[in-house]
Amino acid sequence: MDHHRIRVLVAKPGLDGHDRGAKVIARALRDAGMEVVYTGLRQTPEMIVNAALQEDVQVIGLSILSGAHNAIVPRVMALLKEKQMSDVLVIVGGIVPDEDAAQLKRLGVAQVYQPGASLEAIVNFIRSSVKQTA
């Protein structure tokens, strides 16, 4: 029986200045009983992975609306591997074309959500995915 709350880092990498979506996700995850660490705006991949390591999170949620996902996500995934944190579940939310989403999944991203995705679906995906890896 695991009574530990799921710990999620919600991050806004890159120069994107819109954080409303990330805050909505963070609130939904908190309301679902998860512990959420929100890093704020303009985070580098290094800052995100270091925060994930320090906070001992099981999940990283990246909110990227700037179109920089093809530059940012591969770097985050490489840093996680470098720090032997490949067991951390990575999800991406934002404006990501289908072909890019497929490439991100090949890099190890667990799921990619478009704007308007169901908060309930995101919560359920995290719960079921973290249970499988716990």
Regions from the PLM with identified roles:
Residues M1-I6:
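Non-catalytic signal-transmission and effector/linker regions of two-component phosphorelay proteins
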Residues G14:
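A glycine- and charged-residue-rich anion-binding loop/surface
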Residues A22-R127, Q132:
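Cofactor-cradling patches in redox/metallo enzymes
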Residues L9-A11:
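Short hydrophobic segments within beta-strands
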